[in-house]
Every structure is written in structure tokens, then in C-alpha cells.
Swiss-Prot record:
This is Ribosomal RNA small subunit methyltransferase G. It is an enzyme of class 2 (transferase). Its EC number is 2.1.1.170. S-adenosyl-L-methionine binds at residues 72, 77, 125-126, 141. Specifically methylates the N7 position of guanine in position 527 of 16S rRNA. It is found in: Cytoplasm. It comes from Rhizobium meliloti (strain 1021). It comes from the Bacteria. One of its GO terms (molecular function) is rRNA (guanine-N7-)-methyltransferase activity. Signal peptide: none annotated. Its main location: cytoplasm. Belongs to the methyltransferase superfamily. RNA methyltransferase RsmG family. Gene3D superfamilies: Vaccinia Virus protein VP39.
Amino acid sequence: MQASLTQALNGLRVSRETVQKLEHFASLFQKWARSINLVAPSTLEDLWRRHILDSLQLYQLSPGPKTWVDLGSGGGFPGVITAICLSEAEGGWVHLVESNNKKAAFLRVALRETGARGSVHPIRIEAAPAEIPSCDAISARALADLSQLLDYCAPWMLAEGSGTVAFFHKGRDYQQEVDKAVSRFQFDLIKHASVVEPDSVVLEIANLSRRTK
């Protein structure tokens, strides 16, 4: 592993045991990516920085034994990475929602072989709230624009007494998505600068409600 990556992992306070699990996941990922499209092929050479480190920052923003729902889990970013981090916590779980059967199969193998705390739900996102009635946190990466993501999250975040918080990776044009979303929703927003890409952010959203016309 490059010295710069090791330094970045140390900065995120990742234990040696977790790094070993992440390395095993990376090996599995590279193997499966030869036969199914898990991420854009052009990003495979930069797997650790572009995907693993980018995903790790979510757990740093909301550590501890929480119940997560990861929407459109795809190649496991950030859901499997969060589940690996939770393997050292006393509790917590990640529900990985992925309707593509091939990707869901990969996710099951990744969870099993890394000892991560999670399970795979091979269903459409719209069906997930009926199967996963509550959660502490929601994550999604490279899935949809913010308005659509909030529609997906609404069944959990609008439930009475809900304290669910959502975390979304967004690129340099995130403000346009925020401006569009506030025409339909009210929410508390914290913008966390990405530790990987200087123009990117992680949006932390809480106290969601729909605007009334």
C-alpha cells in the first residue's frame, strides 16, 4: 500500500485489523470486477482512494453501533465499508439494498469473507421500508440526485419520532441539487468537505419534512 494511503488511513483512525479486512475486500472486489460492472472501470486503478477512503469517511462522521440502510449498494461503497468498520463495534448493522442479483451475490460474499456486520436485501429501494422498518442512518453514493434520494428516505425520516440521519456523497455541483431539493423539502444540512476530493462533499441531512403548498 502506498505511504500516502497508509497515512490517510491513520488519519481516519482505522485499526490494523480493519485495514486487513479492507485489504481482503479490495482483493475480492478486484476479482469480481473482472466479470461484473461494480464501478466505472476507469476508477479501478485508484480503488483505495476513489472508493475505499471515500467510503470510510462516512463512518468517521457517524461512528458507533448504529443501524444503517445503504441504498443502491452496488459494489459495496459505502455500505460494505461501513459494515467492516462496525465489526469492531459492539453492535450495529448495515442493511444493503441492491436489486441487481449479480451485485447482491458479490455483496453477500464480501460480507461473509470479511466478517462484516451486514445483510443483503435483493429488492428495489421502494420496497425496503416494509422490510427494514427503522434505522439510525441512511447512506447512498452515486445513486440519484438529492430530491430523489430524499423521496427514497422519506418513509424512514418522516416517521413519527424518527431521528434518522442521511449521509450522501456529492460532487462539485451539489449546491444545484440542494437548491432543487429545498423547493420540496425542509431539512437541517451539514456540508462535510470530502477527505478525498477537494470539490466534493458529504451532505448530512436531518429533521426532514415536506414543504406544504
